């Protein structure tokens, strides 16, 4: 028996057995081997977007509980290493996109434990650029090439402010975006931003922190300026309302010709006297230098005896005219539109066209009230729309109207929506004026406070439709081929009219047969509303199909829609009610803009807004009136008083 015990003890010593049963038998305390560490994988960034055929995206992964440091294997849409259809990812996590657009999933899987992985959504866009106001000549406000921002991913946990780009003054222009641009020998996605200090900036659209590529001032000697020239002091042109304060330089959104890498932009400035200058510039996208015989000093004269006329002609006045509407590029011609500064007399609405290839060549001049006055083309910064034939469509605000008269003068178009031919010069070929035009003008409830949107061609009813609306809150659905002119008794000559909002200072958006509008007049508020269009009837349901819980104070919001074709529609809108002096909604105070995202299938569903996150994580710069969001390649850009703010999927 003693020999058996000694033998067992010797076996315990020699074998060093660690099982509970043997330790107990050997007279030791029970011990257990600790379990292996739990494997966990994380991926960075948590979502991304690239341009097809140009950008790459570097992913990294961290594996906890991997003592042998075996790392990860990479796949795209479940395909190890990916392929040419979904994109290729290297062993180091560098993703190279396919040549076609789409949404993909990049996955990092632990080698130590293949059941553990982490994934990130990967959007690949084929968007060729945002080269003009509201995306296209229809001014429908839709980017249907957005494959990174989805209704599932735009929320406070995964979406927010990425970075800001500081600028020298307020940004009233919409941000424009160009992909794959060679600047100083390197390819960048680039955003272009203009300010009221007459500055123009090019920034890398993706780099955080912000990377400035170049900056020019449009009134220096290299850009046609004279000695001592400055941006315009607000009090030198206004009536004391401080609508744009404290300086006026570039107000209208530029336009880009991507085929020549040229940006066209309007500047306003003054020098001692004061003497006022308005110039159209043609700027090289890669350097900021002038080209195409630019700049050109704006000057024009039309026949007429209207306000400010001399003899039998009306001349363009560089002091009183204000290029508020965005520029349009149509068939090789750049068109600029004007109204007034704070209704300072005398003024007219003007449209002037210049050859995009030679700015010294003026190709068309149109005045909305050559024998009257107080007309203007404001459209809350919206651009003239244009159809496939090159016709321009604009809405005018207030002023003289006599186009319905059978005898001359009958060329004044106050409170009208116009079709203007560009075939030879500029001439009105059709128009619509509401039956209460005189009342609109008398009460300053002008039609032209809102922009014009062209609807897609229809297969039932009139094939060519447009939407126009103003301060009265009525939307007019008009047949572009037969606009209806003026009818004193009613507006029955047009396709449809209905009260849609509190008053429009916006350009509407139209996506998947839904119209989006957030309108509000001074002192009022209204919700973002969506109206359904019935293509078989060729008309709108006059009751909103959905509306937001948030109510937008004056001036409402011009929306933009991003989507992946017909899916993942998101409506973006900026509350700019605290835009500063005079901002009736905020008692003249200036406060941050608030960017909102809504589900485009029902705007009653708010996905996110920039005031939600704690510690002001997503707070924008101080608001500017009529700001339009630009969505491109997984990011949203908005201009403010001192910076451009960039939002996207959080890293």
Positions of PLM-derived features:
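Short, solvent-exposed loop/linker segments at the N-terminal edge
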Residues: 49-55
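Extracellular/luminal low-complexity segments enriched in Ser/Thr/Pro
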Residues: 89-102
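A short beta-strand segment in extracellular, disulfide-stabilized domains
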Residues: 56-62
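A short beta-strand micro-motif common to beta-rich folds, especially ectodomain repeats
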Residues: 102-113
């Amino acid at each position: 028996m003693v020999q058996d015990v000694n033998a067992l003890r010797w076996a315990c010593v020699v074998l060093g057995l660690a099982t509970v049963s043997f330790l107990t038998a050997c007279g030791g305390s029970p011990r257990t081997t600790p379990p292996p560490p739990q494997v966990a994988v994380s991926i960075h960034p948590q979502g991304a977007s690239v341009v097809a055929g140009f950008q790459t995206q570097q992913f990294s992964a961290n594996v906890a509980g991997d003592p042998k440091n075996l790392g990860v294997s990479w796949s795209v849409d479940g395909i190890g290493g990916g392929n040419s259809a979904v994109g290729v990812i290297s062993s180091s996590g560098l993703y190279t996109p396919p040549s076609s657009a789409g949404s993909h999933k990049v996955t990092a899987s632990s080698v130590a434990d293949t059941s553990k992985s982490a994934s990130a959504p990967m959007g690949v866009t084929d968007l060729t650029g945002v080269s003009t106001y509201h995306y296209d000549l229809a001014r429908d406000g839709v980017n249907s090439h957005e494959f990174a921002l989805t209704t599932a991913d735009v929320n406070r946990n995964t979406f927010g402010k990425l970075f800001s780009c500081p600028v020298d003054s307020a940004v009233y222009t919409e941000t424009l975006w160009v992909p794959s641009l060679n600047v100083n020998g390197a390819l960048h996605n680039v955003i272009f931003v203009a300010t009221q200090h007459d500055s123009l900036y090019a920034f890398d659209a993706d780099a955080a922190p912000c990377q400035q590529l170049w900056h020019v001032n449009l009134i220096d000697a290299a850009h046609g300026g004279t000695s001592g020239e400055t941006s315009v002091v607000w009090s030198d042109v206004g009536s004391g309302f401080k609508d744009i304060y404290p300086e006026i330089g570039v107000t209208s959104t530029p336009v880009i010709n991507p085929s020549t890498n040229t940006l066209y932009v309007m500047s306003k400035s003054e020098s001692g006297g004061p003497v006022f200058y308005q110039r159209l510039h043609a700027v090289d996208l890669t350097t900021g230098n002038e080209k195409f015989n630019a700049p050109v000093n704006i000057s024009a004269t039309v026949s007429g005896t209207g306000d400010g006329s001399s003899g039998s002609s009306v001349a363009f006045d560089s002091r009183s005219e204000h290029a508020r509407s965005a520029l349009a590029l149509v068939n090789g011609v750049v068109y600029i539109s004007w109204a007034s500064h704070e209704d300072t007399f005398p003024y007219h609405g003007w449209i002037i066209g210049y050859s995009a290839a030679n700015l010294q060549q003026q190709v068309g001049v149109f005045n909305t009230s050559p024998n009257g006055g107080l007309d203007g083309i404001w459209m809350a910064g919206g651009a003239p729309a244009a159809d496939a034939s090159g016709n321009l469509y604009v809405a005018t605000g207030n002023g003289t109207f006599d186009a319905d008269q059978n005898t001359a003068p009958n060329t004044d178009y106050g409170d009208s929506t116009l079709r203007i031919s560009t075939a030879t010069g500029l001439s009105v070929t059709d128009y619509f004026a509401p039956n209460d035009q005189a009342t609109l003008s008398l009460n300053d409830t002008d039609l032209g406070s809102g922009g014009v949107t062209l609807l897609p061609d229809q297969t039932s009813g009139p094939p060519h439709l447009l939407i126009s609306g103003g301060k009265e809150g009525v939307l007019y659905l008009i047949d572009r081929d037969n606009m209806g002119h003026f009818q004193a008794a009613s507006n029955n000559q047009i396709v449809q009219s209905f009260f849609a909002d509190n008053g429009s200072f916006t350009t509407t958006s139209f996506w998947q047969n839904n119209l989006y509008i957030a309108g509000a007049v001074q002192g009022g508020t209204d919700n973002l509303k969506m109206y359904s269009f019935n293509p078989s009837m060729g008309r709108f349901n006059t009751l909103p199909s959905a509306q937001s819980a948030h109510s937008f104070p004056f001036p409402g919001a011009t929306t933009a829609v991003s989507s992946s074709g017909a899916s993942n529609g998101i409506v973006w809108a900026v509350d700019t009610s605290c835009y500063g002096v005079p901002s009736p909604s905020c008692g003249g105070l200036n406060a941050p803009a608030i960017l909102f995202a809504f589900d485009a299938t029902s705007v009653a569903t708010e996905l996110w807004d920039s005031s939600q996150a704690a510690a002001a994580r997503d707070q924008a710069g101080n608001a500017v009136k009529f700001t339009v969001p630009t969505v491109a390649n997984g990011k949203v850009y908005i201009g403010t008083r001192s910076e451009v703010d960039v939002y996207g999927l959080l890293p």
